[in-house]
Amino acid sequence: MKGEIAVRYTIRHFDLPLLTFEANMDSADTDLHIIKVYEENRSFLPLNLTVSEDGVERWLRHRTIPKNRAYVDALLSKVGLSLNRPLGIIAANKGLSLNDCFWVDAEGSGDTFEKVNLYDNRFSQVLAAIAFTGYGSSIRTSLASCPEFSTNGMLPKCWRRQNGKIYLYKGGTSGFSNLGFEPYSELYAYQVAQVMGVNAIRYTLTKELNKTLCSKCELFTSKEHSYIPIGQLVSKGGIKAILAYYQTLGQNFVDALEDMLAFDAIICNTDRHYGNFGVLVDNKTNTIAAPAPLFDHGNSLFSLGGTDLWDNQKAFDEYARTLLPLAYDDFFAAAKSAMKPRHRAMLHKLLDFHFDRRATRYNLPPNRLKMIEKEVQRRARVLLE
C-alpha cells in the first residue's frame, strides 16, 4: 500500500468507533490495513464482520452496489465512480446503508451519524431517477444522500421518502414478451402470505415513477432494528446448517424457517437465496432479536412464464414441473419435511384460494390469474397429502 495516499477510516455504529483501517480508496487494489480495534466497543462490531483484513474487505464489498444491477454503469458514471474501484464507492457514500446503522467515517471528516444517516436525511431524487431508469445528466452531489449504492439485487430500483416513511420502488425485467411481470408477483405473493398467516412484507403496485409499473414496499429496518441476510451469518452447509443455527436462536426462528419453506413451495419461489431472508438485530444491544419478514418474491408465481402457457393447461403444467428452488433440491420435499400441524391449517385456507383483484387497478389478465390460482390450490393439496 502506498502510504502517502492511504487514508484512515473508522467503521462506526451510530457514532461509536469500532475499527480503524487504512486504505487507498482510489486504487484497484482493495488491500487495507487494520490500525485499531476498539476493544471496549467490540460487542457492537457488525455480527457479519470477521475481524481480519480480508474480513473487513468482504464486509465493505457487501456495502457496494452489485455488478449485475440494472443501470449500474449509468448510475456510477454519472457521479464519477467505477465498479473497478469498490473502495472508492465506499469512500463516496460513507458505507451507509438502509440495512443498518454502521458507516465508514474518513479521518477528520467532522461528520456525525445524525448528520449523514439515510433514515433521517433527504435522498437525492436525481440519483434515484438515474438508478431506476438509467437516464440523467452527470451531477455533483453528496453520494451519502443515495441509498441505491448499498442496495442489493439486479432489478431497477430506487428509494423514496414520502410522508415521513421510506419506500422501495422496484421494476421488472425487460426485453422479451415473458419479462416484466415481477411486480405482479410481489403483490400476489403477499396476498398468499396474508391468507397463510406468514410474516411477509406488503407490496403494492404503482406507476408513480416514469409511468412504469413497479412494486412498492415500505422499509422494514430502522434506527432501532437492522437486517442481516442469513448468508452473511451461515456461510456453508445450506438449509440444514441454517436450521441448526436457528435452533440456537429460539423456536420462533425455527417456526419462521418452516413457514418460509411451506410458503415458497406454494408460490413456487425460484429465487429464495441466502441474501433475501435472515434476521433482525436490535441496534441498542447489537443482538439478534427476531426473524426478518419475508420479501423479494418477484420470481415466484410463474412470473417468467411465456405467453403460450396461459390458455394451455398442459403446457403450463409441464412448465411448472421444470421450476426448482435455488437453495435446496425440491419444493415439496423440503416443505413436507418441515410441516407442523399449524401448516395444515394454513394450507386448508388455500384450497379455495382466489386473488383479491380489488387490491390494485393493475392486474394480470383474467386467464393468467385464474391459472395461477388453480396452481396455488393444487400445490396446497399436494402438501396436504
Regions found by a protein language model. Name each.
Residues M1-A262, I266-C268, L280-E385:
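Phosphate/dinucleotide-binding and metal-coordinating scaffold of catalytic cores
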Residues H273, G278-L280:
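Conserved protein-kinase catalytic-loop segment immediately C-terminal to the catalytic Asp
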